[in-house]
Design a protein with these regions (language model features):
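Surface-exposed, interaction-prone regions used to assemble/regulate multi-protein complexes
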Residues: 1-129
Length: 129
């Protein structure tokens, strides 16, 4: 399933699971009437995660990250060399930003190197992808 082919508005964020090199977001998709797992491998971090009461998604998009226009990546590059292999991950390979905006207009971003979407329960998750 391709992220960009899924209609995300009115979906509900159910769960966020974070591990080394992996973040998984379980989302109830209202259009498909099923739970989906957004698998973020080559996980680098999350910023601005502020969930208090609203978990309904207004918008969700994936963007390639450019160094110069992203504070998160600039800070990451200050801490880690771009060309060193960190357990199969190399920062110079690039990052994606998964930006999720909730109905209260607060958005958060997940930074990783690869994003896949599967039906939740049908996944065979490998954290070393």
């Amino acid at each position: 399933m391709k992220f960009e082919n899924i209609f995300w508005p009115d979906s509900q964020l159910v769960k966020i699971q974070i591990e080394y090199n992996y973040a998984g977001l379980v989302i109830w998709n209202d259009v498909l009437k099923k739970h989906l797992l957004v698998k973020c491998s080559g996980f680098a971090g999350i910023n601005n995660l502020c969930i208090w009461d609203d978990t309904i998604i207004l918008n969700a998009n994936v963007y390639p990250v450019r160094d110069a226009d992203n504070d998160f990546v600039r800070n990451l590059y200050k801490a880690y060399d771009r060309d060193v292999d960190y357990g199969g991950r190399v920062l110079s390979s690039g990052l994606l930003e998964l930006r999720i905006e909730l109905v209260n207009y607060i958005s958060f971003s997940v930074y990783c190197q690869k994003i896949d979407v599967v039906e939740y329960g049908d996944e065979k998750r490998q954290t070393n992808n």
